Amino acid sequence: REAVDQVLRGHEPYPALAVDRHWNLVSYNRAVPPLLAGVSAELLVPPVNVMHLSLHPQGLAPRILNLAQWREHAFARLRQQIAACADPQLEALLESLQRYPAPVRSAAPIEAAMVVPLQIESPAGVLSLIGTTTVFGTPVDVTLSELALETFFPADETTATALRSLYAQHATA
């Protein structure tokens, strides 16, 4: 667990979090809390499910500018996991998420993309983030094999500057 926290801290001032195989939040770095401003307190009661947090109407969803694209990306990731392991808990999670109101789609079709940026409103303005997922390749501890690190990088210099500012404000608060 210390190795996970070390990687998360090393990613600061950019947001990073660790989730279990069911997308429950295990740990996060100090760059994450400022991005959760305005989220319903109910969604932040452990166990916090990151998929629910991002797609729930009282979660991050109202602030995600490309919600239709981000939602489809999240669903595709869940479908891949379900195809690989047929986990009933993941199937139930997907069904639950699909009951949330679908965002109005733009006229342009949503194309499958290797990288789907997360475009989200924040206290520092609009952020454009590119996410990566990391898993431990040779875990000695079985619990590490069930963790994934979700790290977000700025997609542009404006976002990088805003994230550094948010982090500095939060770290000194």
Residue ranges of predicted features:
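Short, charged amphipathic alpha-helical "coupling" segments at sensory-output junctions
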Residues: R1-E2
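Low-complexity, glycine/alanine/valine/leucine- and proline-rich hydrophobic stretches
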Residues: A108-T172
